[in-house]
Amino acid sequence: MREETKYDKEDIQMKKIVFFGGGPMGEGIMGGLIRGKVVEPQQITVSELLPARREYLEKTHGVLTTTDPAEAATADVVILAVNPNQIPNVTKVLKPHLSKETIVISIACGVALATLEEQLGADKKILRVMPNTLIQSGNGYSAACINPNVNDDDKVIITNVLNALGQTMYVTENMFETFTAFCCTGPIW
């Protein structure tokens, strides 16, 4: 079931989403956001180190690309779409550019909220999301767990972002791994 919100999508005016990592999962989320009309392609910036991948994302999706982490300074939402072993390096370059109002979404498997808070700052709005591969068609099912800094208005933004990918269930972090094992392996069968 889609999480219902007290606001319409039109009430949410996001200016910019910045992705760190433009691999397959990041691209799947990006495609869902564009397809779901959450944002226009030019409102998405992808920080990606590989020149060929940047060129591909620009041509395929019409998004902006960069290697400059300072792009996060003007983002409403930052999505960490990198492998778990890359999180420490990404958070190190990202931290100086985040405001307390920026919502940080991590899809890095196994990286706890406490770890992200330690690396980005305990005052940051952070959530973990584990999407499955069906997000590419808008039929995904994602688990999300949030830290205490995420307020009701933030949750509306988050829910509108995640609903573009399919259905979302908010769970406690201790249930996160169980959800991941159940819902993320199912689509391959």
Where are these regions (language model features)?
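Rossmann-like NAD(P)(H) cofactor-binding subdomain of soluble oxidoreductases
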Residues: 60-61, 69-144
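Helical "substrate-binding/catalytic lid" subdomain
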Residues: 175-189
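Internal alpha-helical scaffold of NAD(P)-dependent oxidoreductase catalytic cores
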Residues: 115-125, 141-179
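A general structural signal for well-ordered alpha-helical segments in protein cores
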Residues: 26, 54, 75, 87, ...
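NAD(P)+-binding Rossmann beta1-loop-alpha1 motif at the extreme N-terminus of oxidoreductases
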Residues: 7-60, 64-67, 139-140
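Residue-level signature of catalytic and energy-coupling elements of molecular machines
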Residues: 18, 158, 186
